[in-house]
Amino acid sequence: MSNIIKQLEQEQMKQNVPSFRPGDTVEVKVWVVEGTKKRLQAFEGVVIAIRNRGLHSAFTVRKISNGEGVERVFQTHSPVVDSIAVKRRGAVRKAKLYYLRERTGKAARIKERLN
């Protein structure tokens, strides 16, 4: 029984997901429906958490919009997510960067990973 579930989940998973880690700056393009129109909307920010669960994987992106912190959780293999592009690699030592929620301005900066 579990082999059938694994096979179905494997078929639904996206193959073109780039590798990214917490601390990386990514641009996620998401399909948005407004009335009858469907368009792409970009959300660019720092990845503060990744949850690896196969088909149910998700990641959290945080950005500052008009001086207000905005976080959004994306399902990695969702059909709503059109593309994920890594803009900048960040050098961090933790898997979850929730401490960035309390930091503002220069204190919230992340060093760039050079490799």
Curated annotation (Swiss-Prot):
HAMAP family listed in its UniProt record: Ribosomal_bL19
GO process annotations (BP): translation
UniProt-listed PANTHER family: LARGE RIBOSOMAL SUBUNIT PROTEIN BL19M, RIBOSOMAL PROTEIN L19
Protein name: Large ribosomal subunit protein bL19
Organism: Salmonella typhimurium (strain LT2 / SGSC1412 / ATCC 700720)
A Pfam family reported for this protein in Swiss-Prot or TrEMBL: Ribosomal_L19
Role description: This protein is located at the 30S-50S ribosomal subunit interface and may play a role in the structure and function of the aminoacyl-tRNA binding site.
Cited InterPro entries: Ribosomal_bL19, Ribosomal_bL19_CS, Ribosomal_bL19_sf, Translation_prot_SH3-like_sf
Family: Belongs to the bacterial ribosomal protein bL19 family.
GO molecular function per UniProt: structural constituent of ribosome
Record-level GO cellular component terms: cytosolic large ribosomal subunit
Keywords recorded for this protein, A-Z: Ribonucleoprotein, Ribosomal protein
Organism placement in taxonomy: Bacteria, Pseudomonadati, Pseudomonadota, Gammaproteobacteria, Enterobacterales
